[in-house]
Amino acid sequence: RERIEVNAKGQPIRVLRDIDAMSGKDLQLSIDIGVQLQAAEILRRGQLEPVELGSMSVQRALAKNNDLQAHIALGDDLVLRDVKDRLVPPESGAVVVMDIDSGEVISLVSAPMFDPNLFTGTLLTRDWRRLNSHPRTPLLNRATSGQYAPGSTFKMVVGLAAIEAGVISKNTQFNCSGDMELGNATFHCWRKGGHGMMNIISALEQSCDVFIYEVALKTGIRKIKDMAHRLGLGDVTGIGLPGEKQGIIPSHEWKLANQGRVWTPGETVVSSIGQGYVLATPLQLAVMTARLANGKQVTPRLVKSVGDAAPDFAPLDIDPYALAIIREGMFKVMNGGLGTARNYDLDKSLGGMAGKTGTVQVKRITKAQREEGIVNNIDRPWAERDHALFVAYAPVKRPRYAISVVVEHGGSGSSTAAPVARDILTKLMQKQG
């Protein structure tokens, strides 16, 4: 190889010296390019249909849509039609697929994407401006650096912490009437009429908020924080990619150090459903899911093999019975009669999957918007819509893969993110046989 001097524009000036190459160890990356490309396409299209760009009506619509113009300027000609018959760019978000036993990352998708070849030579100013000013920030690796409120995917953490602390058992029940009073505040369940009597399994199956509120207050934020860290949240994963974020798992100490104020019980309630200060990356959510699936300290890696090295993950030191309860709840999400993702399970011939949906509020619908008739997520500006999340492992009886999906401003985790995971795992498992 050569060491070359370049000018400020990246243009070669002269060769400084030649460096003799040295043989190294055999190295194979874990990313499966076939799965990577399929996962990216499935994420970007979601459940929407592509349109042909050649028609005059489409061209007229493009001329009025700044988001689409910025998207096409990146060289991407995929344009979709949403349920309101509007032309929209592909979905933005992230997908992470891991091998549970080895920790190998099979797919690491971030969308929107860009052509990395732009950086191999002289990067033109106009290309840099397009990338840097794009409204959906294609230069951000959402899989490792995107930090999102995990929403209801965090409920497994709370449930596991409560079981381990002896606060609840498999059969402990609380009544969900649709809301819970705490001091002068009222905290609502997503289901206005309430769910009735819930235990931890049915609460995960139906994603009951009030049950989790009650459990979190009795467990305490310190035990919840400890469990979150044991499952891989709140710390960088060590995957070795630049810019990886560690997320936030808040606590009394965190709030005092960062805001100079004391922690309140209401913040425990909000944190328990994965909102408030709680943040996680899609990679961390995949790690959490892998650890729940096999009870070990699974660590992600991008190198499939270096010589004969093989992982040997230590146990999580969590009661297997407690883990089994949480797994049963995740199974019911996909297979229970009232499971929030019951319509999106894997084909039984592939072994099915266990998962958890999450829908994260980005911004409340204002009174003015309601007066204008805006009451549904899809009617709002894209940047104000809820995020859609989903985590799962498969097959159920002998877990091999863990997946996390985040669709930015995608709406429902059930109807948007879960089918993305199903379709990706279907392709992967059919390929593997």
How would you describe each model-predicted region?
Residues 309-314, 420-433:
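Short, gly/Ser/Thr-rich active-site loops of penicillin-recognizing serine hydrolases
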Residues 3-24, 28-31, 57-153, 157-407, ...:
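Beta-lactam-recognizing serine transpeptidase/beta-lactamase-like catalytic domain environment
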Residues 32, 36, 285, 413-426:
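Short, charged, low-complexity patches
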